[in-house]
């Protein structure tokens, strides 16, 4: 793993002078105009539900949603896309996106506030930005398991090679992209309100993510088949975790500090104080192996993809060391023996794009299985029993931190039941062992009217630590129509439903209406650009 990310950094450095972009195809020196091409967006949304807001009216909106049966917001955003300077060797982008919500967990939401710069092919972003999912359809997929689009953006400093760069060997068949980021969670006040300081919470938690993707393929017109594969990893570390003990008392748990904590977030290592003699890894480490196969035909494009989630070595590498001695040597590595885990937990999906389709344009179908989690047993070596079995992975939860969530919404796939649904003040994912099937499709009914449909069936068993007394089921459905009056005005109406037990999502039905206006801000720089 160390070599993987060292290679990623080296490739990013090599990529800077060689990747083909617009500025490589022109000798013209573009005048710097940092105030041109500023786009605006004004948006109003209202949701009305019987029960809570249904799943697909709430999920995968970058956390800009509420479960309250009546909620809404007014939103104003200004953005200068980084792509504005694609003809220059350097680029500048920035945005401010502010929301005034009704019946949300905040009175004011700064959804996005960032500035980013590009020099040749490397990009540096500082602030909160909505990042899309990789290797999946952002409108139709149920969501990535690690770096999803379900929670509010985390303010961060992010260094990236955002677009695939062709490596200068292998005949142009290999391309690479990736990122490294550090930031800080912003939901301290929400955690205080939600738990009432009576259950576990964590303040000033630091965030780290990294990802690297390799694509094998060439010009799709000549070579229609391509493969994409990658590793996504994230970590919550530092801060001040407050943990509720078995006797009901609250204790402040020491966490890693300083440069060593940042290093252990980047290269998993160290250990938490609570690990005791059985050192694990410092912080909440997690990630996914991802892969996608693509075939590009004349009239259609097909993608088949996989997303394998892990919380530790047992699912990251599907093996763990199990060669400890006995007696006085119970904690000494004696033999080359390993415990092999099964590859059961996985997300499998397929995406079909009809290039000239109208009524039907894109179809996504996904299958998720998360029941295994390295098995129902977790045992560390002792003087009597030397076997080491690292089961009970408890996806999205953690002993010291409040799990893979931000502002109550899971950061990954929303089929893991987000803590915001809990009514007991506990910030935990209470259903992370499930099987699910998901279908999404969209199309255009006319040149102005488009639609989108999402449908999901899920069967859950709770968690290993707190299992349901029996398996529970849930079905969620959404149909959405969008009408564009002109290039500036758009109206969207969506109807969603949930059918399930209270341990899942319950019975909900709701209507969501969104009105938006977009355009180009009238500035002197924009007027000058339009005259060219």
PLM regions and their residue ranges:
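Bacterial Sec-dependent N-terminal signal peptides
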Residues: 1-24, 515, 532
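Transmembrane beta-strand segments of Gram-negative outer membrane beta-barrel proteins
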Residues: 22-74, 85-96, 178-182
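Exposed, low-structure sequence patches enriched in small/polar residues
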Residues: 4, 223-231, 241-532
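Transmembrane beta-barrel architecture of outer-membrane proteins
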Residues: 39-43, 69-77, 108-112, 154-158, ...
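Short loop/turn motifs that connect adjacent beta-strands in outer-membrane beta-barrel proteins
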Residues: 24-40, 81-93, 118-122, 164-178, ...
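Transmembrane beta-strands of outer-membrane beta-barrel pores
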Residues: 44-52, 80-82, 96-102, 119-121, ...
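Surface-exposed loop and membrane-interface regions of Gram-negative outer-membrane beta-barrel proteins
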Residues: 87-117, 131-150
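Internal, well-ordered domain-core segments that constitute the primary functional module
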Residues: 132-253
């Amino acid at each position: 793993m160390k070599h993987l990310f060292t290679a990623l950094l080296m490739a990013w450095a090599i990529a800077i002078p060689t990747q083909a972009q617009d500025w490589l195809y022109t000798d013209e020196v573009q005048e710097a105009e940092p105030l041109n091409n500023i786009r605006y967006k004004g948006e109003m949304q209202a949701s009305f539900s019987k029960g809570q807001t249904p799943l697909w009216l709430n999920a995968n909106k970058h956390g800009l949603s509420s479960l309250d049966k009546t909620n809404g917001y007014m939103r104003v955003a200004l953005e200068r896309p980084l792509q504005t300077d694609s003809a220059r060797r350097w680029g500048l982008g920035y945005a401010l996106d502010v929301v005034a919500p009704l019946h949300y967990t905040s009175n004011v939401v700064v959804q996005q506030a960032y500035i980013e710069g590009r020099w040749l092919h490397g990009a540096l972003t500082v602030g909160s930005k909505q990042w899309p999912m990789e290797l999946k359809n952002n409108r139709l997929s149920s969501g990535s398991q690690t770096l999803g689009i379900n929670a509010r953006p985390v303010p961060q400093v992010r260094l990236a090679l955002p677009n695939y760069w062709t490596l200068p060997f292998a005949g142009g068949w290999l391309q690479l992209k990736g990122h490294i980021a550090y930031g800080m969670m912003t939901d301290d006040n929400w955690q205080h309100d939600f738990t009432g300081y009576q259950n576990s919470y964590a303040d000033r938690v630091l965030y780290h993510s990294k990802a690297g993707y390799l694509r094998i393929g060439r010009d799709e017109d000549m070579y229609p088949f391509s493969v994409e594969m990658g590793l996504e990893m994230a970590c919550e570390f530092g801060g001040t975790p407050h943990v509720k003990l078995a006797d009901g008392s609250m204790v402040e748990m020491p966490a890693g500090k300083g440069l060593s904590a940042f290093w252990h977030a980047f290269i998993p290592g160290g250990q938490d104080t609570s690990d005791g003699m059985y050192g694990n890894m410092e912080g909440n480490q997690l990630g996914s192996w991802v892969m996608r196969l693509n075939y590009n035909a004349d009239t259609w494009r097909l993608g088949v993809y996989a997303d394998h989630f892990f919380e530790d070595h047992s699912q990251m590498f599907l093996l763990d060391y199990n060669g400890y001695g006995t007696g006085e040597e119970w904690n000494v590595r004696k033999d080359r023996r390993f415990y092999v885990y099964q590859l059961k937990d996985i997300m499998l999906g397929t995406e079909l794009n009809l290039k000239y389709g109208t009524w039907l344009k894109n179809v996504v179908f996904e299958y998720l299985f998360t029941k295994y989690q390295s098995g129902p047993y977790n045992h560390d070596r002792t003087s009597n029993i030397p076997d080491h079995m690292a089961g009970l992975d408890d996806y999205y939860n953690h002993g010291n931190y409040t799990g893979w969530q931000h502002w109550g919404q899971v950061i990954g796939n929303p089929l893991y039941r987000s803590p915001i649904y809990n009514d007991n003040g506990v910030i935990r994912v209470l259903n992370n062992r499930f099987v699910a099937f998901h279908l999404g499709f969209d199309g255009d009914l006319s040149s102005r009217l488009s639609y989108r449909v999402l449908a999901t069936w899920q069967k859950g068993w709770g968690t290993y630590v707190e299992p349901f007394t029996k398996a529970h089921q849930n079905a969620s459905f959404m149909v959405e129509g969008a009408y564009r009056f002109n290039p500036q005005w758009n109206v969207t109406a969506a109807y969603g439903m949930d059918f399930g037990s209270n341990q899942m999502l319950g019975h909900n039905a709701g209507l969501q209406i969104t009105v938006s206006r977009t355009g180009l801000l009238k500035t002197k720089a924009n007027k000058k650009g339009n005259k060219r």
